[in-house]
Amino acid sequence: MTNIRKSHPLAKIINESFIDLPAPSNISVWWNFGSLLGICLILQILTGLFLAMHYSSDTVTAFSSVTHICRDVNYGWIIRYMHANGASMFFICLFMHVGRGMYYGSYTFSETWNIGILLLFAVMATAFMGYVLPWGQMSFWGATVITNLLSAIPYIGTNLVEWIWGGFSVDKATLTRFFAFHFILPFIISALAAVHLLFLHETGSNNPSGMTSDSDKIPFHPYYTIKDILGLLILIMALMLLVLFSPDLLGDPDNYTPANPLNTPPHIKPEWYFLFAYAMLRSIPNKLGGVLALILSILILAIIPLLHTSKQRSMMFRPLSQCLFWLLVANLLTLTWIGGQPVEHPFIIIGQLASISYFSILLILMPISGIIENHLLKW
């Protein structure tokens, strides 16, 4: 008799995705982040669901409802901080996952890569709207500044912004719709993640060498399930250290002041995971140019497969490209730091140079290094 996990229609899908899935025998710890992202998504949906039970999406009561969750709801404080810091963990895993894809040439799976870019945009949109919900000073002014960027779109910009706001400023209508979208988007992300996996399982996983691994496959369970559980334990430990010892480490003190449209905070800035893009936005003096830089900083990922000039897929055996990759990482860290600094000398010029080098590395230097490495192969 056939095992039920191989015959039952539903169990068969799970079996072919997580148990009997043939996986390359040499995938490293960098391949752990996909499963960790799945765990983060589940954690965010669960904690978010319990927060939504007590949250009130009205400008008058939103701030006090979050305070009520932390003070009066059983274990409300831990649910709230797990949700807030869970977002940070989500983005750490996301950046690692995208970085892995770039380093090892996983972007050659174009469908999987493009769905991944859609997922990245969806997660960023969700996180932005979630940041508005506590209705603190940074929530209100962050929402005002970021949504106002759409007014840079010629002709329809102003109408578009007022349509999104549901009025002539960020107010009750904006908060209510942001809550609605913040609630629904994670479920859309779940569906996209399933499609992401579907496309990945059409081709099979990449591996560090970038070469085909059809001749050397091992079953996903128990080898990679055990490996993923180790990653999960480290993730949970890091999250709980953050939640229990310094839950406000990554937040902004201004968000503990209720939103006040009459008082602008001295430095308006988003959460840390958006700072690199925010720094690019601020480094261009023109409004429309800044908005384009902001969008292109992520959208540039879509053309990375077209800029692949090397005969080798992975960067494992390409020292020149490796140097450029780590230069890009250092560059992004610099941009993240600059995004959190006030707009004054020397931060302005550092931000501009870092923005130029970000696009230069991706669009010019990496394709050139691929061509140089191809020539070096002939020696």
Curated annotation (Swiss-Prot):
CDD domains listed in its UniProt record: cytochrome_b_C, Cytochrome_b_N
Major localization listed first in the record, in broad terms: mitochondrion
Transmembrane region(s): 33-53, 77-98, 113-133, 178-198, 226-246, 288-308, 320-340, 347-367
Disulfide bonds: none
Topology versus the membrane: Multi-pass membrane protein
Note: Heme 1 (or BL or b562) is low-potential and absorbs at about 562 nm, and heme 2 (or BH or b566) is high-potential and absorbs at about 566 nm.
Sequence similarity: Belongs to the cytochrome b family.
This protein's name: Cytochrome b
